[in-house]
Amino acid sequence: MIYDFENFTGFLSIPDIHRDVAGYLNLVDGHVRRLIDGGPIVGLQQNLNSLDLKLLHEKFVGDGVMFILQVGGEDEADRSSNIRAFCRRLVYLKNHFSKVNAEAMRFMPVADLPQRIRFGITYGTLIELPRTNGTSEYVGFAINIAARLQKYSGNVSFLASARLPHADKWMTQNGFVKVKATQLRGRPNEFVYIDEVDFTNIKKTKDAVLFEEIALPASPASKK
């Protein structure tokens, strides 16, 4: 999973803001981590429970932050359940990001904070490259896809690859639309899931050409 902020470069260009950026990023990072580890989150009266997701690696990638997660579970159904819950939480956070900014107003010296957070998420095999200092780097196609999804359209705040396990069984039932990302660099035939609200809004903009809606057959369970 990779996330970044709308107009983060502009945020960094505010005069003499750099000493305060760390506090802002740590605040956001804490909320994203609590989506995994559990705990209090903005706008919710009760704490989130922890998910069976292990954070293997976190690093800045350009102007975004990459999380490499190991998905736990006894079988594919368990792993799918963990990813489903994580996706729901990511969408919740992006929908309530203004509350994170309201929290940041307590210590930030300026009001012009990034207005939106954007997520790109996928699933796949990565290769671990151990380093002599005891840390590891990771490489693999999944990282490339997540980065491209997160940057694909500035008007979209959440894109999930259809490579997520069993995504076809739960994404469209939970407020997502399956579309083809027609101009995704290197993979113009990649299927992705987009938040239904985002998709409705983007169809009214010039970025509508970035997505091709597909007609899905009715699932066997829905046939009478």
Model-predicted segments: where are they?
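Alpha-helix/helix-capping structural signal
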Residues: 6, 124-126, 144, 163
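Extracellular/oxidizing-compartment recognition motifs
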Residues: 149
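Intrinsically disordered, glycine/charged-rich C-terminal tails and inter-domain linkers
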Residues: 154-224
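Catalytic NTP-binding/metal-coordinating core of nucleotidyl cyclase/transferase enzymes
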Residues: 1-88
